């Protein structure tokens, strides 16, 4: 895949913090913490591309690679379930139509923000573009609560995804990394030692005083 294609998973970082996303995807900086390592373990269990299960009218594909030229993104779906029915996509070597449902596995429990939902919606848009079909729903599976959460792929979510990736592509093409703005989310960020948001905040205050004291 073209190196200039953005990663689907990046939308999670972008929702959490635009600077974090830029540090990872533009400046190629990364630090692991306990949560990121645990998250990688959860996904390793899903990304076995050779494992395809067939259960009656259900086809289960793991680690499926997807992309969208419209959004300029690529990535992997943890799981895509194809259910045979009267609508969906035509699959090579399979009879009939198969309706795809993306399933994303997540650490912990449902988040307060919509980052997981937007990532799932992006996967759905990619699958639609690749398979020439329509996807109305997908699922988020959280390991802490051990159940799926159904997500409706609405027009509002689709528009939000389009707008966010347009902004991300703009930042990426310009090589723009937003300035640090310290807030409560910074405490649990794996990049806080690279970002140094508190130092950036102090520096901006010092700059303010320097500018305002010069004329005194």
List PLM regions with ranges.
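Structural motif
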Residues: 4-12, 114-115, 177-184
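Short, charged low-complexity intrinsically disordered segments located at boundaries
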Residues: 42-45, 52-56, 150-158, 190-202
């Amino acid at each position: 895949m073209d190196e200039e294609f953005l990663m689907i998973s990046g939308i999670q970082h972008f929702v959490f913090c635009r600077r974090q996303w830029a540090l990872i995807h533009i400046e190629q900086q990364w630090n692991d913490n306990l949560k990121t390592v645990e998250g990688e373990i959860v996904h390793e269990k899903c990304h076995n591309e050779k494992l395809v299960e067939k259960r009656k009218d259900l086809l289960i594909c793991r680690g499926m690679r997807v992309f969208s030229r419209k959004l300029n993104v690529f990535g992997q779906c943890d799981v895509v379930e194809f259910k045979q029915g009267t609508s969906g996509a035509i699959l090579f070597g399979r009879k009939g139509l198969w309706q795809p449902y993306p399933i994303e596995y997540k650490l912990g429990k449902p988040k307060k923000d919509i980052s997981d939902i937007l990532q799932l919606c992006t996967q759905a848009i990619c699958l639609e573009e690749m398979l020439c079909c329509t996807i109305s729903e997908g699922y988020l599976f959280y390991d802490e609560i051990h159940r799926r959460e159904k997500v409706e792929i609405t027009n509002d979510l689709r528009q939000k995804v389009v707008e966010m990736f347009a902004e991300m592509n703009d930042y990426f093409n310009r090589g723009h990394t937003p300035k640090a703005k310290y807030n409560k989310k910074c405490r649990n960020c794996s990049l806080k030692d690279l970002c140094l948001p508190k130092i950036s905040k102090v520096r901006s205050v010092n700059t303010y005083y320097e500018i305002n004291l010069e004329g005194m």
